[in-house]
């Protein structure tokens, strides 16, 4: 059974251990924040000017029909371009640009139709996969907040299939499996959806390191088309690409932690794939966001206007969606100069965020956010800056249906023709 930690004052060994893990994790991150504050700012000020893309403040750099326009055979723009608000304004192709062929990693049958249908729905426009980290489980819920998938279930636990501090979890290309980084267990695992088998695909469970077979606090494992996956080795200060248990590419130098990409990276907590084979990286110290091309060259680097950048996500028009892992936390859309184009972040009240770790764009133009330490996932309408959908009870961790405990990862799954989750249609970013 999964330990019930509904009561924050629970004195059981499992609850004490969970709280101790949270304290250790926050202490480690606080140490990194202090290190950032003590660093000499002059070098950072010079580095921020290294590279800047020629695009203007989030607007499109090329006309529709060019490489970066909102066209594509499988995901062509509808006759009337519908604005996705700040997430996908008409100027960059509207909502259709969110799933246009040049804005997704890989081409999968059914994606355009599934996402176009979802773009017309208010609220949660499909299914949401949630990495319920504090409860060591993965959930998939529908718009009515009903659980349609859970791993592990009782049979999985009886068979010895269990998760340990599973962090970010994403659907793999093709929809046959899920990939998850077990951050505090120092490994990456794969869950097969058909037979519910569980496999360690990199790292040694419970052993931290940063060499050819070990990772130290892995974050954001993404499976790429072709069988290679990328993961941020957070405190190894590198981003690695792994295939068949072997590192086949690496950005950053193992255990050399400083900002000089791509040769050196500081503590890394984001490594989002870009459509053309590059990677969008967030470094904790200095609040850096970097993009490295598929050939390994630095495209740009800027200081994000946040205290702790987390998991940057590419948007149409050269813009970036970013979470600020702080309390109160924020969600921003920035351009490649680091200028904020949109920001959400109430300082108090029910809309306040407490250490949001990931923000993702939905096909309907809303933004869904992991609100880690308020134990919920919220959907925000960026046109009104209001929460329009929520899973989890605010400030109340738990294991019962409707409850979460430090949700730290998620993925959007559109509905298929039969109304169920269409894992095969999922694309990233």
Please annotate each region the language model reported.
Residues 2-5, 22, 63, 81-82, ...:
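Hydrophobic/aromatic hotspots within intrinsically disordered, low-complexity regions
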Residues 1-34:
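Terminal targeting segments of Actinobacterial cell-envelope proteins
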Residues 46-48:
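Hydrophobic multi-pass inner-membrane translocation pores used for secretion
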